[in-house]
């Protein structure tokens, strides 16, 4: 069984959960602010195992995945079972009505690949989807709740394809645990109860959603209550009988479309054709050589691997190892590298099936030139997009869209050495708040830029029919000598990129074990202001960073990093102390 090594993180006090903020500047989609509050901080212990390991954001889901792995299931099998459970016990973060990105290592073929199951804009969507009759961007709250923001879900299609390719156990056996849990009821966790209370107004807007998440006395479901979801159980029974494709070709798909159009206060344009024609796209991993490792992740429409790769590539020109994690100068360099990477992200990164993108964003000479813009000990005055190599350059405008994901991450390694890193989402907390067949529908389309043009130039991440919105999700597998060394990822809006970069630097540069790296206080700089994690030793960086010329804020940081590391043939795992996650293995 699993063994644990105790390690106490550098947290001073436990921050309180914060309510989601829905007051955003017009013209922004949902990227800078993350709606899912951090849970009270907990002390987490490094987990040890020999044969297999799983790390998820919810203990119930982790136990279900563990049981699948224990029974001989593959990493893909375990993910299928876990995702079905998360859609029930963590509905604010992911589910059947959302999308995901997966990085998968096939041990038999020694092959690393990625799968894009991002939600997709309807064929009837126009660049004016989130603009009023005068062409002005809608306020975020006016866009997110209802049918307008719903894209074609991709998660169920991903589950089916992963099982078809990599599954070992019968499909119906993987859906059975979540089906039973939905029938018998699960215990509402403190985190879910807090999210329900924070989202009370939006959840009360539609009768079906209100009936499920509210008690008869008008209060939201409380921690410790047992909550049954019979429609969800019926959905899983149908999927277990007819397969994943039936979600798209049968009654469920038709009812998703009806629900989107039936939200008469904010209807969408999703069609039956959008549902039936959805495809998961297998894409080549984006990899960056770093300190003897290959850091690999998801390419566009995710900006994750490119932006994380740029941060690492720029910081590699400084001796972070010598500086160490307590050095304000080290964090200044990481922060300015992040600002430069985010500048390129805002200018260039989007769905490359629709817009051309520079080929040289991870070119070694380009990153070396970007690193020369950074002066240790002095804040970079401005971070402008660079001029990487192009094949077919076009003039794009900077995008200030914001990503507001309520998201979850799963890391799994099975006994055969197969590994999967999946970040899964419905975007905002509880998505669009529309509910059908026991699950919530995403609001993923608000990850597009609400504006189409800026200063007469097109924005790469603008709405277009059939396009997939840009994401910051960064599921990562670090390879060493051709085999997985680290499996990691996180939720958290566009801060995901900083959370993952921090964890990689902490393990690969500073020699921390995976739990220490995850628990390391968060310090993030995306757009010029340093954000330091409240109640942790990161606050000690405030004065030194201000002296360097930065504006600094202190706030709760809602990462949910789940990671597994392989050292000397042994599996070690970590879960984020800011959430309810659990690592299990044998």
Residues of each region from the PLM?
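Bacterial N-terminal signal peptides
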Residues: 11-23
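Internal maturation/activation junctions in enzymes
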Residues: 317-425, 576
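Active-site rim segments in enzyme catalytic domains, especially the processed small/beta chain
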Residues: 88-95, 99-114, 131, 266-271, ...
């Amino acid at each position: 069984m699993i063994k644990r090594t105790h390690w106490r993180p550098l947290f001073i006090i436990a921050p309180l959960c914060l309510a989601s903020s829905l007051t955003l500047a017009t013209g922004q989609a949902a990227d800078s602010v993350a709606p899912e509050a951090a849970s009270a901080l907990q002390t987490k212990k490094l987990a040890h195992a020999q044969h297999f390991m799983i790390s998820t954001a919810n203990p119930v889901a982790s136990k279900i995945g563990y049981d699948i792995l224990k029974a001989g299931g593959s990493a893909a099998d375990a993910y299928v079972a876990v995702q079905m459970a998360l859609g029930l016990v963590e509905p604010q973060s992911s589910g059947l009505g959302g999308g995901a990105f997966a990085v998968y290592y096939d041990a038999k073929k020694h092959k690393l690949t990625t799968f894009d199951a991002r939600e997709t804009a309807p064929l009837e969507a126009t660049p004016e989807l989130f603009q009023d009759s005068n062409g002005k961007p809608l306020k975020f709250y006016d866009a997110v709740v209802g049918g307008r923001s719903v894209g074609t879900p991709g998660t169920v299609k991903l589950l089916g394809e992963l099982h078809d390719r990599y599954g070992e156990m019968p499909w119906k056996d993987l859906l059975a645990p979540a089906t039973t849990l939905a029938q018998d009821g699960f215990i509402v966790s403190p985190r879910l109860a807090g999210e329900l209370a924070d989202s009370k107004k939006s959840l009360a807007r539609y009768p079906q959603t209100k009936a499920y998440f509210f008690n008869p006395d008008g209060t939201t479901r409380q921690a410790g209550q047992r909550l049954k979801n019979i429609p969800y159980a019926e959905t899983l029974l149908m999927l277990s009988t007819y397969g994943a494709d039936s979600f798209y070709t049968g009654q469920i798909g038709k009812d998703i479309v009806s629900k989107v159009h039936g939200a008469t206060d904010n209807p969408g344009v999703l069609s039956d054709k959008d549902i039936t024609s959805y495809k998961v796209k297998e894409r080549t991993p984006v990899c960056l050589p770093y300190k003897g490792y290959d850091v690999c992740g998801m390419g566009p429409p995710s900006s994750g691997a490119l932006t994380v790769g740029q941060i690492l590539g720029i910081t590699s020109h400084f001796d972070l190892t010598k500086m160490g994690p307590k050095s304000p100068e080290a964090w200044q360099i990481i922060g300015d590298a992040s600002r430069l990477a985010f500048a390129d992200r805002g200018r260039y990164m989007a769905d490359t099936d629709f817009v051309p993108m520079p080929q040289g964003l991870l070119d070694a000479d380009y990153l070396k030139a970007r690193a020369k813009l950074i002066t240790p000990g002095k804040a970079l005055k401005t971070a402008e997009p660079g001029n990487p190599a192009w094949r077919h350059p076009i003039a794009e405008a900077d995008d200030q869209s914001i990503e507001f994901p309520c998201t979850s991450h799963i890391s799994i390694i099975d006994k055969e050495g197969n590994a999967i890193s999946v970040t899964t989402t419905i975007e905002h907390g509880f998505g669009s708040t529309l509910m059908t067949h026991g699950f919530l529908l995403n609001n993923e389309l608000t990850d597009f830029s609400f504006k189409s043009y800026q200063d007469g130039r097109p924005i790469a991440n603008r709405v277009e029919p059939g396009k997939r919105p840009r994401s910051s999700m960064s599921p990562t597998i670090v390879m060493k000598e051709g085999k997985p060394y680290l499996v990691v990822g996180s939720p958290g809006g566009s801060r995901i990129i900083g959370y993952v970069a921090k964890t990689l630097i902490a393990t690969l540069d500073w020699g921390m074990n995976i739990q220490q790296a995850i628990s390391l206080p968060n310090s993030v700089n995306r757009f010029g202001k340093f954000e330091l994690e409240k109640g942790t030793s990161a606050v000690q960086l405030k004065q030194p960073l201000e002296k360097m010329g930065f504006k600094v804020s202190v706030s709760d940081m809602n990462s949910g990093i789940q990671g597994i590391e392989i050292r000397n043939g042994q599996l070690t795992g970590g879960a984020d102390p800011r959430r309810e996650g659990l690592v299990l293995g044998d």
